[in-house]
Amino acid sequence: MGVAQEALELARGGAQTGEFVFRVSDVQECAASGQDDCSESACAPVSASISAGEKPFEVATVVRLGVSMPYVPAVPYVVALGLCQFLRAADESFGVHWPYDICYKDQVIASIKATAGYQEGMFAVVSIAADPKVLCSAFDVADNTELLANKVSELVVQSVSVWEQQVKRARSFAGPIALILSDYFDMVPLLGQQVNKVYPSGNVALTARFGGIDVWGHAILVDQDGKEILVSEEEASVVPAV
């Protein structure tokens, strides 16, 4: 069972905001609630033999939501923004790779997913799979992956909490990510560049300029004739044109 599924089970069992599950490598797992200790063997440092590009560290955090359902699709964007802002405070080479991966220069170093559910209120489980070496350095935790999981989960909770306050102050609903869109724009390095729209099969559908992102999270591509093409995350990915 993956950490996201474990966290979902915890949430359905009444787990509260901030409870999390994390795993290091494919076989080591650790569940934690707040500051609870885990066994030393389950939280061992990542092996130096792990190859570049793999993301053997994963943490899934339960967040009880205080927003209405139309806002829920924004959660992974909110977390991506919060994590990226934190990372960019130390190094501006970090960015958001649409829709909500974290990149360092041209390399994706963290992937974010969110799964919503309802049990004693609306909740989301936010899972982050990442290169632990990059995050350990950014969060200044050496090779302590348990502490890293705790700090990442705290940042997830903080990011969602700040956004929820924005939602509560908003006078009307303008789209799930409308309230963070301006800040989100600033984190996406591919905006304005030539990109390929790539289907899940790997086929390139078109090459166009990455013109923007709408309030629903769609990428807006602009072709050579000035026509705007909306791309959803389910339909295709957007990558730099070669």
Kindly give the residue locations of the regions a language model identified.
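Pocket-edge structural micro-motifs
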Residues: 26, 61, 223
